[in-house]
């Protein structure tokens, strides 16, 4: 009885343990488990088996024999290892996973654009502080330089054109700061300075203006000047028609004037002699006293002046500006055009209603020298000179960059028969079709000759 209870307890104990299943020694075999089941007499136990190997428990050796009966129970093994591919059995098809669509990574340019677009309030404040600090520092430097120029002027020294213009610019910048004194004197009014600057940005000195803003302003003024130039060209053609009608049709002056106007309209660049010759016909009509309001307004815009007020005020404004231009021309002629820098050349051409953008340095010097020759040497009226510059304002274009001619290396003929050079590159054709055509013509000529011989023999 004790033996029976011992064997039954031992069998139940081994079947209830977590190690009741044994992993196969090779991954090619299916996961099977063999359990020990007691026989009818409860004297022997069946052993676990995997394949052909047998495992016996300690204590079950001796005279106890093992029956060949085994109970085979399939059971899935919980393991983290993959089964190896068996060479004899077909493997289940594995569906490849589709690659997941990954979002494109933002480039550095996109990151910089996002960073620039999302400026914080602190960065904006820092940029504004730097902007005003640089403007005031440049204004302080210009003020010190202007003080030295004034000291030299008081001691009787003669100033150059560049020094005089710098002194005038600095004085204008200092006087622009006078209205801001009111904001400082009145308490708590300094908080309105940003609003005032937003409404009137031109009240700041020239040292606060950046290069990009200057270029944008010049481009806008250039577009307005082109429109004004077209209007002034129409006025010139109308005046030419009137003068041609007044003159006799048979006279040489009328025919030459008509041809001159046609050449100018087609883009011909008139010479100084032609301008001087035909300027005598327009002296009375192009005087400031005889110009109408649309023409006066157009000339004021051409010289970048304010076009507000009565006709007499516009004439007086134009007269004073033309006098200052003549004095400046005399100084430039005395110092020489070559002494001017590129920025000074552009400013001088812009003040005289000529093109200043899109030209080379040589073209700027050339048109300025032509202006000086006509204004100082030939004594052309300034109003006519301004109207004549409108044709240059549209027609003048920058010169293309000339490339140096390519150096061709001499070619040597290595035993190849030289062929006659073609007349032009466009006349080069393939000789194969021509040869085929000649062969066909030769064959046809032979056939016709044979037919003619046969006919003659038959006759």
Curated annotation (Swiss-Prot):
Residues 26-176 are mitochondrial intermembrane. One of its GO terms (molecular function) is ribosome binding. It is found in: Mitochondrion inner membrane. Residues 220-440 form the Letm1 RBD domain. It comes from Rattus norvegicus. PANTHER family: LETM1 DOMAIN-CONTAINING PROTEIN LETM2, MITOCHONDRIAL, LEUCINE ZIPPER-EF-HAND CONTAINING TRANSMEMBRANE PROTEIN. Residues 435-459 have a biased composition (Polar residues). Residues 198-459 are mitochondrial matrix. Its main location: mitochondrion. It is a single-pass membrane protein. PROSITE patterns: LETM1_RBD (PS51758). Residues 88-114, 403-459 are annotated as: Disordered. Disulfide bonds: none annotated. The gene is Letm2. It comes from the Eukaryota. This is LETM1 domain-containing protein LETM2, mitochondrial.
């Amino acid at each position: 009885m004790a033996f029976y209870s011992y064997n039954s307890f031992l069998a139940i104990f081994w079947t209830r343990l977590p190690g009741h299943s044994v992993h196969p020694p090779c991954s090619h075999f299916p996961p099977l488990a063999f359990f020990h089941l007691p026989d009818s007499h409860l004297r022997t136990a069946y052993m676990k088996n995997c394949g052909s190997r047998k495992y016996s428990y300690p204590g079950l050796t001796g005279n106890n024999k093992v029956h060949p009966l085994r109970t085979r129970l399939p059971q899935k093994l919980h393991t983290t290892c993959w089964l190896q591919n068996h060479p004899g059995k077909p493997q289940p098809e594995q569906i490849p996973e589709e690659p997941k669509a990954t979002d494109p990574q933002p480039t550095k340019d996109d990151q910089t654009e996002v960073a620039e677009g999302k400026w914080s309030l602190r960065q904006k404040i820092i940029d504004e502080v730097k902007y005003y600090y640089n403007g005031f520092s440049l204004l302080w430097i210009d003020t010190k330089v202007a003080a030295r120029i004034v000291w030299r002027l008081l001691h009787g020294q003669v100033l150059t054109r560049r020094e005089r213009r710098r002194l005038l610019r600095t004085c204008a910048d200092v006087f622009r700061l006078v209205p801001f004194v009111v904001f400082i004197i009145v308490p708590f009014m300094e908080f309105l300075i940003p609003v005032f600057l937003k409404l009137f940005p031109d009240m700041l000195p020239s040292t606060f203006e950046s290069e990009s803003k200057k270029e944008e302003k010049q481009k806008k003024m250039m577009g307005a000047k082109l429109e004004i130039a077209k209007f002034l060209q129409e006025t010139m053609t109308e005046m030419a028609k009137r003068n041609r009608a007044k003159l006799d049709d048979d006279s040489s002056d009328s025919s030459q004037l008509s041809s001159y106007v046609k050449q100018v309209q087609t883009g011909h660049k008139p010479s100084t002699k032609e301008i001087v010759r035909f300027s005598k016909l327009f002296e009375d009509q192009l005087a400031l006293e005889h110009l109408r309001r649309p023409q006066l307004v157009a000339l004021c815009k051409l010289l970048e002046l304010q076009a507000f007020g009565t006709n007499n005020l516009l004439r007086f404004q134009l007269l004073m500006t033309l006098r200052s231009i003549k004095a400046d021309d005399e100084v430039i002629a005395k110092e020489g055009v070559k002494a001017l820098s590129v920025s000074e050349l552009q400013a001088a051409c812009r003040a005289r209603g000529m093109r200043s953008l899109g030209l080379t340095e040589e073209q700027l010097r050339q048109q300025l020298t032509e202006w000086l020759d006509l204004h100082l040497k030939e004594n052309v009226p300034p109003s006519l000179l301004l109207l004549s510059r409108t044709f240059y304002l549209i027609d003048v274009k920058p010169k293309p960059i000339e490339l140096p001619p390519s150096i061709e290396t001499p070619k040597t003929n290595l035993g190849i028969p030289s062929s006659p050079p073609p007349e032009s590159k466009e006349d080069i054709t393939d000789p194969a079709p021509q040869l085929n055509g000649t062969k066909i013509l030769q064959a046809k000529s032979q056939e016709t000759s044979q037919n003619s011989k046969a006919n003659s023999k038959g006759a």
